[in-house]
Amino acid sequence: ANRRHLQGEKRRPSASTCWTCKSPDVPRMMQEIGVDSFYNNKWAAFGDEIVDPIGCSDCHDSETMDLHISRPALIEAFARQGKDITKTLLQAMRSLVCAQCHVEYYFKGDGKYLTFPWDKGMTVEAIEQYYDEAGFSDYTHALSRTPILKAQHPDYEISQMGIHGQRGVSCADCHMPYKSEGGMKFSDHHIQSPLAMIDRTCQVCHRESEETLRNNVYDVSVRPMRSEPVWKKNWLRHISKLNSPGIRERQRMKCNRY
């Protein structure tokens, strides 16, 4: 834990659920004391037990080195959808090992049980409906007093709903592309941006030049974000006006729905 997290622990102790994606020691602790007991505790309670960084056993079976799922939340999310994750094919597993952590989630109930809100599907609309019916929100906006959901890091959901996921491209295809050394082909475990190795990632499927592919990413991902400060400033100004004394409550509630 870093210094800022330790300082935060003094003010408001974090749930031990926060350890879930931090170490291969987590599955061991879950097996020893039970999943419910692991979640329903404080972060500091396991500080002397969880000491190793993310490692091989988080994604690989220690005996066979096959890809496997080591975190219960993902298995449970599949089960609630009527799916058996143990029947997943290798190409899908090259994404699912990532989906153990790189997903949207929340801590359910007083026991802080780690839950993926996929019961109705993985689209934004389906997840929003799940939260609405559960009556859950991450916080209430200080100005508008509107309940707010804060997406954690829904990387897997975005990938699966996008064109690459629909075409069967896995997380590893782009972030851990295959390489060959000594006559052996294996996944590069130096996990990084696909743009760092375009010849082994994008250009496996896309025949455009490296410059064109980089520009495509810029146009889709970077350029829209640079316009954010303008609309954000206007939005905050609008919210401030809504909370002025001259705005009637009915008008405020109507506007807050948007």
Feature annotation, model-predicted:
Residues S14-P27, C59:
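Long, hydrophobic/aromatic-enriched structural stretches that serve as scaffold segments
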Residues A1-A15, T20:
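N-terminal alpha-helical interaction blocks
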Residues A1, Q31-D173, P177-Y258:
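Primarily the internal scaffold of c-type cytochrome electron-transfer domains
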Residues R11-S14, S23, E49-D52:
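Active-site-adjacent structural elements in enzyme catalytic domains
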